[in-house]
């Protein structure tokens, strides 16, 4: 069974391993720590110089050299302390920058499945809050611990040399302070750990609600979300109060111990001064050294508390860094993407015992339009995720021509796919940046304008004050739904994909926007292998092939007319769409 010491080492090992992964400058870090040590050693001279000053104090004996020496020591200590603090903070920031870069690089390369199962707010908290915990340890508490140890040992050594009897009295204070501070430190760690977790949860809640504030307002759900947020705030408040209660004990208890020690030293030391066994200067030095023993005890205790917090933060960061990355480069390059896509008995479930798709087989012809229709929850969107290779089939194979798609690199596969989703998400930035998003090559203004023109987006872009340099806002909120879709179509046109995947959403647009988007889509679909989750009857009627997906299975395939004659559920779908179109026309009339 591992001992307490072995457990402590096993917990520290991952922490130091993580710090090493940031490639810190050990020389600069050692130099900064060495400066802190020198600062502490210099501070140990001050009580001795004060002793000499007090013992030889008289107006006639007061020399400028003595005063100058004490002043010099003070200035040297202050200067070294300032530079050591800066150097430690600089190195700490470099390490944290390296940690954040490691985490960011990992997060960007993690598969979609990770983000489907982990709240984005909690992940953000790991990159921001947890790294700050480690930074505080490196920049403040490690140096405080080392200098604290040196200060305590150095002070006690000097005191023993000066007067061993009085030093024994001081030594009683050290274990007494430890008995008080160590349990408080453990309690602080427990509360801090809970606070970190609660902060991550609260950050997750904010990231969930604020991006969807329009839905909140449209649903009159402000009070509901206020209640959820208030619960998180209340939990953080309670943890803050618990932390304040513990912290409120530290200062008074240290003061109590210090005052008790001070009274004992002054009382016993005063007796020795009266008997001539101790000089007045030595007693003053004793009192100053007493402060240099008690105060670092608090630093040492805080170090262990912060170390425990950092170990907890490290464990969570290591969990992210241990996740398997999505390999985008291994595999062949696609030389010809104008080939049929074949689904051969494809099954998939997010959980092994709950299949969403069950032995789906189909051929998506190259250069033609395949429309996927069916009731909600049938598996249409999941099928898209498999085709994009966000997930791999649980069973079965997806092929391009005769080759399984997983023999091609993800990078090559996704280069040949253009995806226009229902939401048509845009990144914060300009219209130009969004149209060129993801392209590694340089794109000319003429190419951007041509893509925008083909997407029926050029006219509205030209009407904007800054045209292509117009900021679209967070998630493209400054643009309308139809404008966002046309920007997404322009982006897809610029990529010039062989395979187009479209999750149709024109039903949510006004008639003019719908017409513009439909025209843009027709241009985009021309000559490409197109797979569309269809909601509009016009798309279905014009498609070369329909796949009717329900309950994870393809229950019908063929043209619109063939399915109207043979598939009852499809016929209901088509008639419902016809009725909706007629209602819209009547309203428009």
From Swiss-Prot:
Q: Which residues form the ABC transporter domain?
A: 341-576
* ABC transmembrane type-1 domain location: 29-309
Which GO CC terms are listed, alphabetically?
plasma membrane
Q: Where located?
A: Cell membrane
Q: Does the keyword Transport apply?
A: yes
The consequence of residue 380 to A is:
Complete loss of ATPase activity
Q: Which domain of life is it from?
A: Bacteria
A single GO BP term for this record reads: response to antibiotic
Q: Please provide, alphabetically and separated by semicolons, the GO molecular function terms listed in this UniProt record.
A: ABC-type transporter activity; ATP binding; ATP hydrolysis activity; ATPase-coupled lipid transmembrane transporter activity
Keywords assigned by UniProt?
Antibiotic resistance, ATP-binding, Cell membrane, Membrane, Nucleotide-binding, Translocase, Transmembrane, Transmembrane helix, Transport
What's the pH dependence, according to the entry? Optimum pH is 8.0.
Residue ranges of the TM segments: 29-49, 67-87, 142-162, 164-184, 249-269, 278-298
Q: What is known of its domains?
A: In BmrA the ATP-binding domain (NBD) and the transmembrane domain (TMD) are fused. This is considered to be a half-size transporter that undergoes homodimerization to be functional.
Query: Can you say what this protein is called?
Result: Multidrug resistance ABC transporter ATP-binding/permease protein BmrA
Instruction: Write down the species.
Output: Bacillus subtilis (strain 168)
Q: Which gene encodes it?
A: bmrA
């Amino acid at each position: 069974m591992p001992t307490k010491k072995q457990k402590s080492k096993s917990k520290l090992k991952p922490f130091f391993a993580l710090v090493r992964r940031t490639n810190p400058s050990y020389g600069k870090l050692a130099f900064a720590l060495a400066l802190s040590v020198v600062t502490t050693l210099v501070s140990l001279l001050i009580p001795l110089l004060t002793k000499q000053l007090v013992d030889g104090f008289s107006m006639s004996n007061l020399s400028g050299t003595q005063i100058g020496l004490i002043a010099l020591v003070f200035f040297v200590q202050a200067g070294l302390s300032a530079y050591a603090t800066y150097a430690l903070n600089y190195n700490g920031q470099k390490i944290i920058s390296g940690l954040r870069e490691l985490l960011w690089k990992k997060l960007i390369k993690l598969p979609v499945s990770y983000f489907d199962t982990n709240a984005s707010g909690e992940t953000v908290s790991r990159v921001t809050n947890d790294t700050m915990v480690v930074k505080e340890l490196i920049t403040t508490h490690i140096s405080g611990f080392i200098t604290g140890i040196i200060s305590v040992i150095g002070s006690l050594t000097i005191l023993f040399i000066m007067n061993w009897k009085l030093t024994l009295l001081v030594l009683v204070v050290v274990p007494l302070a430890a008995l008080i501070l160590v349990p408080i430190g453990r309690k602080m760690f427990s509360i801090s750990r809970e606070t970190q977790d609660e902060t991550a949860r609260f950050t997750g809640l904010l990231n969930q609600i604020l991006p969807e504030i329009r839905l909140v307002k449209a649903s009159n759900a402000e009070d509901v979300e206020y209640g959820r947020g208030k619960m998180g705030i209340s939990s953080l408040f309670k943890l803050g109060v618990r932390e304040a209660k513990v912290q409120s004990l530290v200062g008074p208890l240290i003061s109590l111990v210090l005052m008790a020690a001070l009274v004992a030293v002054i009382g016993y030391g005063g007796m020795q001064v009266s008997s001539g066994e101790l000089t007045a200067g030595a007693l003053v030095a004793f009192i100053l050294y007493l402060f240099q023993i008690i105060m670092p005890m608090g630093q040492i205790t805080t170090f262990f508390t912060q170390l425990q917090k950092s170990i907890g933060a490290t464990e969570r960061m290591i969990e992210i860094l241990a996740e398997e990355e999505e390999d985008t480069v291994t595999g062949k390059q696609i030389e010809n993407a104008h080939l049929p896509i074949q689904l051969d008995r494809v099954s998939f479930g997010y959980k092994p015992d709950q299949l969403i798709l069950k032995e789906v087989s189909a051929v998506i012809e190259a250069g033609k339009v395949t429309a996927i229709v069916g009731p909600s929850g049938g598996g249409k969107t999941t099928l898209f995720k498999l085709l994009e290779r966000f997930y791999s089939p649980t069973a079965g194979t997806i092929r391009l021509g005769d080759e399984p798609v997983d023999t091609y690199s993800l990078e090559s596969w996704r280069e040949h796919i253009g995806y226009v989703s229902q939401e048509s998400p845009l990144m914060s930035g300009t219209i130009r940046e969004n149209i060129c998003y993801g392209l590694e090559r340089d794109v000319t203004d003429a190419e951007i304008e041509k893509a925008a023109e083909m997407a029926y987006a050029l006219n509205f872009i030209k009407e904007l004050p800054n045209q292509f340099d117009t900021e679209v806002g967070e998630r493209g909120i400054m643009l309308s739904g139809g404008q966002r879709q046309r920007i997404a179509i322009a982006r897809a046109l610029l990529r010039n994909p062989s395979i187009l995947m479209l999750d149709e959403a024109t039903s949510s647009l006004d008639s003019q926007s719908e017409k513009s988007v439909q025209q843009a889509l027709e241009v985009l679909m021309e000559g490409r292998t197109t797979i569309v989750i269809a909601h509009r009857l016009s798309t279905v009627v014009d498609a070369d092939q329909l796949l009717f997906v329900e309950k994870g299975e393809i229950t019908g395939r063929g043209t619109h007319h063939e399915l109207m004659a043979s598939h009852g559920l499809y016929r209901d779908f088509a008639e419902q769409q016809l009725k909706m179109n007629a209602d819209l026309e009547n309203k428009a009339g």
